[in-house]
Amino acid sequence: LILTQMAAAEEATVYSVVSTDEKEKLAYEAGATKVFRYGEDLAEQIKAENGGGVDVVYDGVGQDTFAMCLNVTRPRGLVCSFGSASGDVEPFKIQELNAHGALFLTRPSLKHYVATDDEFLMRAQAVARAVEEGTVKIRVHPPYSLENARQALSLIHI
């Protein structure tokens, strides 16, 4: 939801993909332009919405969505795989990126973006400023007991 809020604040067209009605509502509240549900024809639905795919995909799911991410990205677009909620992406032939239109692929890690004290401070200040200005709203849930850990974990994935 934070990424959606930040992209929407920059006036990007934001497509979110979710699995439940509640997550759909949250995505729209965060600024998503259009929300889709996981399904077999997801890439085709998104391409139909904007006439040919997206420039950038941010994927926190991993294994279950990686092929769709490649299919929905426009030629010379960027796929940013930052999570593995469904498991790690299987090894693949790098030529796949060319077959989908000379795509760029990255797997960022926070430690590489806060490698120095100056970088850390700059990024921390940017996040704090976004929260102070109301660009990013952080949802805080009440604490859950250990018996309700499964319920608490179900709330952290969009």
Q: For each of these PLM feature ranges, what is it?
A:
Residues L1-E40:
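Mid-domain Rossmann-like dinucleotide-binding core that forms the NAD(H)/NADP(H) cofactor-binding site
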Residues I156-I158:
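Conserved small/polar residues in nucleotide/adenosyl-binding loops
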Residues A32, G53-V54:
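Local beta-strand N-terminus motif with an aromatic residue
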Residues V57-Y58:
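N-terminal Rossmann-like NAD(P) cofactor-binding module of classical short-chain dehydrogenase/reductase
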Residues V127, A149-A152:
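Non-catalytic, hydrophobic alpha-helical segments
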Residues L42-G51:
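Short amphipathic alpha-helix with an adjacent loop that forms part of the alpha/beta core around
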Residues E10, V18, D64-T135:
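Glycine-rich phosphate-binding loop and adjacent beta-alpha segment
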